[in-house]
Every structure is written in structure tokens, then in C-alpha cells.
Amino acid sequence: MIQQARRVAAGLLCALLFLFCPTTLAGCGKVSAPASASAVLSAVCADPDVTGRDVPDTCAIYTRTADTESADYLSDTLFSALFGEAARGLLSGSDPAPAAINDAAVCISVSPTPFEIAVLRLSDVRGTATAAGICRTRLDAVQNAWRGTEQEAVANAGAVTVEGSYVLLVIAPNPERVLRAARAAIRAGGS
């Protein structure tokens, strides 16, 4: 009687494993690739909670994925002009060191208002301190440029944050709202 109960229990266990194991394993295979920096920036700019409130209508967007001949291409020269001398070589790397930042996208207001979003995606989280440092330098420069103006509070509200292998720089009227949209886009991945 006990042996028969054990056989029935083992049979039920095998049936349950047979039914649920493929479903569980299929779910494991749905790990999406990391979102590109331009995909994160596009998602932020398209987010209805951000658009119209925090993103001005007149923005210039520069991405690493744009055609190298395009005016929208985020070149090493433009990147180091924006983020300072410490940023030189971080996008392109140098022999034999690979690029520390393997993808980047920047949105800058072309109207006279302090607004900027930078999304930097790194190949290794160990480089986030360096990337956050250049973003902090950029934020300090923007804050100094707007000191004593009516937009000083917006510049001073800017934030630099690290989200896994991403570093985000946000200068906006409500940086937390922009960061929430960026975090959601990062979590969604490249799907």
C-alpha cells in the first residue's frame, strides 16, 4: 500500500514537472538585451509624463548610433567638448584599451533653458565611476553657467545617477520624473 502511494506520488511529481518545467525554462530564455542609449533616450522623450513638461520642443539629439556623416552623430570630439578633457577616448577607446562607454545618446536644449539628458551605456559596471565623474563635471559646468539667472534652480536640480551599466545625467525642471522614465526604459531592455 505504501509502495503504491509512493509510485502514485512519483507519477504525479513527474507529470507536474513535465507540465511546468518547459514553461519555466521558456520564461528563462526571455532575457532581453540591454536597451541602447538612443532607445532609452527616445523612450524618455516619448513618455507622456515627461513630454511637454520636462522636454522642451527645441532639442538637439546626438547619438553614437547615428550615421558618422550625420549632424546627429555623437563624435568623440563633441563628446569631449561636452563632458571635458577627462571624457576624451572614453567612447572610442585606444589601443589596446577598449572603449569604456560603448553607447551614448545626448539630448540638449537649443533654446535658452538648462535642459539636458545624457544616457551612457557601459560594457562593464566597473567603469560607472569614471562615467559618473564626467557627468558630474558636465552638471557642475551647466550649474555654473546658469548661476545668478532665473533658470538657476532648474540647473541646480540636475542629477547624475547610475542604473546598473548605465549612467544618466538629467538637467530638467523635474529630474526625478525623467529618471523614472529612463529607469523604465532600461528595465524594458531591448525588447
Model-derived features: where do they sit?
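Bacterial N-terminal signal peptides that target proteins for export
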Residues: 2-13
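Bacterial N-terminal signal peptides
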Residues: 11-24
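Post-signal peptide N-terminal segment of mature Sec-exported envelope proteins
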Residues: 35-52
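Extracytoplasmic/secreted envelope proteins and their assembly/folding machinery
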Residues: 38-41, 117-119, 128, 132-136, ...
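A short, solvent-exposed beta-edge/loop patch
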Residues: 109-111, 121, 151-191
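Short Gly/Thr-rich strand-loop-strand
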Residues: 125-163
